[in-house]
Amino acid sequence: MSNKVTVERAERKDGRLWLYADNVPVPLVHVTPKRHMLVDSDALAFVYILETDDRFLYVIIPKQWWPELKAAFAEGEPIWLESEGMALELEQFGEELAYLLENIRDNANYGETFEQAVQEVFFAE
């Protein structure tokens, strides 16, 4: 079983950003938000960490969904993951994203391609 959960669709609805994924290996009822994010600079993705009793799951948010992420972030909307009719709030997502964006801006340590992609989506005038 893969520990990676790739977001396949994103939609702002009812004052929230909904991230949809069909490949979650365990029901969301058995998952706890870790309240921590990473980046995958090679895949141009933000990664939110979830936890089960015996492993971590990594919610991969590819660049194609960043415009929706930016709009929801600007409005302070909560971020939710939905899979197979179950939903889970990705707690502390906004705070984690803000921290990452601040660190990524003008910082080549994340790789030039990733830093440029973040600049284009999140900091474009």
From Swiss-Prot:
Q: Which InterPro entries match?
A: UPF0738
What family is this protein classified in? Belongs to the UPF0738 family.
Q: What is this protein called?
A: UPF0738 protein GTNG_0708
Which organism is this entry from? Geobacillus thermodenitrificans (strain NG80-2)
